[in-house]
Amino acid sequence: MYQGPPQPPPQAVPMPYIVNNNTPPYPNGNINFPPTAQQNIPPTVYPQQVPFPGQPQGGQFPQPSSEQQVFNQLPQVTQTFHNSAQNTNATGGPGSGSMPMFTPVASFPHPMATAATAAAPLPRSASQASLSMLRVPYHVRKYLSNLAMLKLYEIINEVNTAMGKIGLLSFWTELISDIFTPDAVIRYSKKSMTDYREFEFIIPVFPVICSTLGRFGIVRMEVKVLQLKTQVLSNSTIFFNCPRVTFVYYYPDGSYITHFSQMKGAFDLDLKINWLDVSMHSFVPDIEWNAVERLLSDDTKSTEIEQIFRKLKQEDVKEQGNSFAENNATNVPPNFEAITQLRSYFDVFRNVSVFGTQEGLMRVMQISTVMSTLKNLRKFQIEKNIDSPVTALSAYIDADKKDSGSEPLHAKRRRNSGISPRTTTLGPNGNSNTSNEELPTSDVNDINKDMTKKKMKF
């Protein structure tokens, strides 16, 4: 604390005698001060000091004014903290209360409070999660997107190195529980030249589908992604998109099939997938050269292979009538029967549908979609505490009929089309009606039957 300007000593203290070069030396070498030294030496003169407001005069120590007393007070420790965006600890996370914030008295407002009040107000429509992600700096959001990309590559590596575990249900159950959230939804669509299929699965049935691949002869899977992009959205999710992804399924005889697809989905902040959408648009079956060599070197099949090659070398095969082409009126190669017979020796061509998947696996996926749709029925049975599944189904249908009159049309269609609340299956020419118009029960039943036929169609 400042004590004011220095003051001269009192008059009772004698001042020393200043000896200069003109002072004659003393014979005994001692300096004796004359008795009149105090009278001959003038007192020390100090410069005039400008007093502070409220400083008393008269050579006493000045007293601080009321403003200085407020300024000199120690800061007070308060337990009130600002929001998580302003009060952060050393690790960058929101403070938990272990680091107190020192706030001066009311005469000197805190600069953080002034900056917070001067900031522009945020829109009311934004949610709390959106506001928190909007405040996150760009380098933090970029860091989270890179983490999601590394997580996706880690998942792909787990699938690619799962040789010998494709048919194990325990392996897929553990892997999928680590990848997806419990309420995640997986959509898988297939497109051919003449048809389009769409499936939706919930997490409990998805391991069954993956383990079914091993029971149909697949020994190894390989996933390749190109042009992978990730981005942190304002709703605290990390979106990823891969327009070029290939799924390769290998069979033990050396044949394989490649599915060309597009994939997109979203991670949460725990780096678990909330939803996944895979769309397959084409496929190409292929055979490795060593598989052809094994077939040609097999003595038990040499006679059959020679007959197939003899059919392929016939010169007049184009002139002969093809029963398959005549009955189906389709453009097929003239040696289609020989090619079909040669394909039968490889697993990749056995019972393959026009979607590039075996018919048995297509049925399993269809049943899994139906079971996923029955999730709402299972919830209804648990809520109503009904033991019999048949009784629960009847009560669920009756409750659906009662609620169908007051439910909007677009809500009926969404509820009847699938389980995912994030998607709708109205089709490309569908027009969702957002008005609250009511339909009779017969119209609702017709809509339900039409949608059920579309979902159950093979």
Curated annotation (Swiss-Prot):
GO terms for cellular component: cytoplasm; nucleus; transcription regulator complex. Residues 401-458 are annotated as: Disordered. The keyword Repeat does not apply. Residues 417-445 have a biased composition (Polar residues). Residues 446-458 have a biased composition (Basic and acidic residues). Interacts with FLO8 and MSS11, both morphogenetic transcription factors binding directly to the FLO11 promoter. Present with 1010 molecules/cell in log phase SD medium. Belongs to the MFG1 family. This is Morphogenetic regulator of filamentous growth protein 1. The gene is MFG1.
